[in-house]
Amino acid sequence: MLASGNDAAVAIAEHISGSVDAFVELMNEEAIAMGATCTHFDNPHGMPSETHYTSAYDLYVIFKNAIENEKFVEIIHTSTYTATITNVNGVARERSWDNSNRFITGRTDTPDGFTIIGGKTGTTGEAGYCLVMLSENSLGQPIVSIVLKADGRSNLYLLTREILQEFNN
């Protein structure tokens, strides 16, 4: 979740449902149960395909459900995670993953009056630069912001800042 892990998404899918196809079916059922009716998953990792799509509203619905889970919020709020990995020969090494959300890592300034809780970035050629994010304004009100199809990373954060500032007046 900090940085996209397509291999991990496939491993989780196979572990939970026995196969990617069975997991994707479960994802689609869950999306409909949440009310995300303009979404169809074709894989567990979000890579493009003709039958893999969603809408900004459905992303909001899915994200709103996800942030009810405290562990999810903890993960999306994490700047860097370091794990010790041991290979089959017993040799251990550390591996770190950085959050791809530049507001969380401090590589982009947080808008005045906001606390960034966390979010998830995504980037593909077709979708452009995307960010779904939870923050709080100066009144402590939670704000979910969604930017899709930004034409560059810096523009993604500029658009997100502009959206957030509309909620701090």
Regions found by a protein language model. Name each.
Residues 18-169:
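Penicillin-recognizing serine hydrolase domain
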Residues 1-2, 20:
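Generic alpha-helical segment signature
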Residues 2-15, 42:
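Substrate-binding clefts and substrate-entry loops adjacent to catalytic sites
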